[in-house]
Amino acid sequence: MKSKFAVLFFTLFLLALAIDNVTTICPPGCICNRQSVGLTCKPSPGSDMSARECLKKTCSYGYC
């Protein structure tokens, strides 16, 4: 019984990690905000994108 529980817990942990890494590239006019916890997007300099529109998306570590 403990073995099944351990396998289930480990599987759920891996699934949570996988879901956390599935993120969206920042839209055009937005860049990754490295100072933000969770790596959100922010308007790039000279862009007319609003901060609200950029904050709707997040970026993964590979795109920052």
Curated annotation (Swiss-Prot):
Instruction: List the signal peptide residues.
Output: 1-18
Cellular component annotations (GO), alphabetically ordered = extracellular region
* Principal subcellular localisation of the protein: secreted
One GO MF term, please?
A: toxin activity
Tissue/organ expression: Expressed by the venom gland.
Describe how it is modified after translation.
Contains 3 disulfide bonds.
Where in the cell does this protein reside? Secreted
Q: What is this protein called?
A: Putative neurotoxin 4
Question: Organism's domain of life?
Answer: Eukaryota
Annotated keywords: Disulfide bond, Neurotoxin, Secreted, Signal, Toxin
Which family does the record claim for this protein? Belongs to the scolopendra neurotoxin 6 family.
